[in-house]
Amino acid sequence: MKRYILSLVLLILFGIHQTMSAQDVAVKTNGLYWLATTPNIGAEFALSNKWTAELTGAYNPWTFKNDKKLRFWLVQPEAKYWFCEKFEGHFIGIHAHGAQFYSTLAHKRRDGYLAGGGISYGYDWIVSPHFNIEAELGLGYAHIWYKESECVPCIKGQVNKTTNYFGPTKAAISLSYLF
């Protein structure tokens, strides 16, 4: 299933790229995710002079000291409205997010999903004709559903839980390359 989704996303991105002209496509990565040892990549496409659409993905497969885990994958699409013009200056956005996670922190095992959305504000600085730096902060909602157990190595005693989260849902300091 993951291969099918990845193939579909790559096909869509390739098809969109074939119809775009210069400075209408950006590939980016979020430095804050890298600080948290989470590889990530995003692509942003101009829809008009003031609107862009972005799709970002992140994946954390690592196991840390003492067999601690915070594994997850995340997808976050976003539509942005630019006050000046695309890829320059202030913007506001609306984003959605979906993720799957597996955690063994705090002597509890949690295995679950989240979905939600929010609004964001950001600013994009032009560094050179092809490089930009973008800062963004988003607030919103996430519905989280997961299985939790006290015993990390076993699955006995699992409890189904749900929670609703309101607060920061996006934080980014990204380096972008514009085509």
Feature-to-residue mapping (PLM):
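Transmembrane beta-strands of outer-membrane beta-barrel pores
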Residues: 31-35, 57-63, 81-83, 96-102, ...
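Bacterial Sec-dependent N-terminal signal peptides
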Residues: 1-25, 175, 179
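Outer-membrane beta-barrel "beta-signal"
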Residues: 79-82, 165-179
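Membrane-embedded beta-strand positions of outer-membrane beta-barrel proteins
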Residues: 27-29, 43, 55-57, 77-79, ...
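Solvent-exposed loop/turn segments connecting transmembrane beta-strands
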Residues: 26-41, 64-71, 106
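Repeated loop/turn-to-beta-strand initiation elements of outer-membrane beta-barrel proteins
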Residues: 25, 50-53, 87-88, 129-133
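Flexible, solvent-exposed loop segments that connect beta-strands
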Residues: 58-72, 98-114, 144-164
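Residues that define the transmembrane beta-barrel architecture of outer-membrane proteins
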Residues: 23, 35-37, 71-75, 111-117, ...
